[in-house]
Structures are given as C-alpha cells and as structure tokens.
C-alpha cells in the first residue's frame, strides 16, 4: 500500500474562472536522503474564493501512475486481466471499460465487496491474488455482475509504490505545474503515512476465516474487528467490545480501539 499525505496547495498569481489539477500531477520529497515522487489520484477543479485559488485537503500518494489496456477476446480461454506490477497499490485501482476501438464511450466499474444486490447489469469487478503475488481483475458472468463483450477495452490505472519507504515525508515541492501555474505554496496537513508491505501469508491465514465468518455482517465483536481491518488497512491491531463490558456499562453500542501501523492517524 502506498503512503499518503494530505496537503493544501495555494496557487499564487493565478487567474481565470477555475484551475484544474490533473490526475497524476507530481510532487517531490526526500526521506532520509532518498528522493520520492508523490502524485494525485484524481482530477480536482477549484474556483477562486475572494480571489484566492486554493486546493484544500489534497491527498498525495507515493509512486508512479501506470495504465494497462486489454481488448476482450472470448475466444482466448486463457485471457486474464492482470495487474502486472507486484508493488501495485490495489486501493488506488481505477477500472474503466471502453465500448470498442471505434466507440470511445467509457463506463467505470467499482470493486464488488459482496454479492448482495448484484444483478446482471451491475458494473463491478472482482480482485483475486495469483500464485506469484500479483493481482487479477475479473468481471461478472451476466448473472452476477455485467458480462463484458468481445471488443470491449479494459483499462486498468493504478499506482506502483515503494510501500513503506516514504512514510514520514513532510515537505513537498511541485514537480511540474498545475493548470499552467508553477508558483505555489504547499502546506502539509498530514505527513505521509500508511505505506506498508503486502499482507503476509500468516496474516491472511488468520484473517480470512474471520472475514468469511462475518459475511460482511457486524454482529459479534470479532465481526467488527474483521470489518474494521478491511476498512482501515493502516490498522496494525484492532480490538472491539460491547459497551456493556465497560466499567461503567453503556448498552446498545460497540466500541473499537485501533492502533495505527504508522503515523498517529488513520487514512480514510
């Protein structure tokens, strides 16, 4: 998983009715003498407020933005839509499907987190890890999830990261320009944190049965712990308990305590 920092960016001497910061806009930083690139993972547009052009609460991710395209061919029984980089951060993955070479219409597909409420029109994708530690994207069969057609073009965009190496990065400089403007003031609101290695086999062996048992339902304390670990990958450890177990009982509530793997806050 890629480290993420939160910054405010003030555009000095800007003009116009709005300013667009493109997805993939780069920023540079140094940690322990080593340089790293951070970037945005979405397009952001602002309009001036009282003549001030300011991007607030911008999330920056360490790594490089990568794009792969596949053309669907049902005659190829071995075709797979692979994320080819083992250091890819799948939480940054964006999956879009173009109708065909001659039809540039794009549809965005979202990660399916369960099977409930899915039908043959649901534009979702699924993720599974392959034997070599890389990930494969696959789609519905026309019953659960929309089925792709021959000629569709699958576009995978994601960030390849150095994992935890850039945790703690606190000072950033603009690597290029934002909407043609390069005179900026960057204020760091949250140092880079959350960068981590891939989940170990031992952790998967422990957590997988708990996630299967919970079935995306939060009933027992163990269910809550499992779901919270899924929602917050930067959580090193999670403990959940019912309010009735407190020294001063509080009924009808569940309390959760989380220890972050890095930094002092949890990324959303």
State where each predicted segment sits.
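Signature of Asx- and small-polar-rich beta-strand/turn repeats characteristic
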Residues: 1-268
């Amino acid at each position: 998983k890629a480290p993420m920092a939160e910054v405010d960016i003030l555009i000095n001497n800007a003009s116009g009715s709005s300013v667009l910061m493109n997805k993939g806009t780069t920023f540079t930083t140094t940690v322990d003498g080593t340089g790293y690139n951070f970037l945005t993972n979405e397009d952001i547009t602002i309009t001036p407020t009282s003549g001030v052009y300011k991007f607030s609460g911008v999330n920056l991710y360490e790594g490089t933005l990568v794009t792969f395209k596949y053309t669907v061919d049902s005659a190829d029984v071995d075709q797979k839509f692979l994320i080819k980089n083992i250091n890819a951060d799948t939480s940054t993955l964006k999956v879009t499907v173009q109708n065909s070479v001659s039809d540039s219409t794009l549809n965005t597909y979202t990660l399916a987190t369960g099977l409930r409420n899915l039908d043959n029109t649901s534009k979702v994708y699924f993720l599974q890890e392959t034997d070599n530690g890389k990930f494969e994207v696959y789609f519905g069969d026309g019953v659960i999830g929309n089925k792709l057609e021959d000629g569709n073009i699958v576009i995978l965009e994601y960030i390849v990261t150095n994992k935890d190496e850039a945790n703690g990065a606190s000072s950033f400089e603009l690597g290029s320009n934002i909407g043609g403007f390069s005179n900026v003031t960057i204020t760091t609101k949250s140092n880079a944190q959350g960068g981590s290695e891939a989940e170990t086999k031992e952790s998967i062996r422990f957590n997988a049965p708990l996630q299967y048992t919970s079935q995306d339902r939060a009933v027992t304390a163990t269910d809550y712990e499992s779901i919270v670990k899924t929602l917050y990958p930067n959580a090193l450890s999670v403990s959940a308990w019912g309010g009735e177990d407190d020294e001063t009982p509080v009924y009808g509530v569940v309390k959760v305590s989380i220890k972050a793997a890095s930094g002092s806050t949890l990324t959303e």
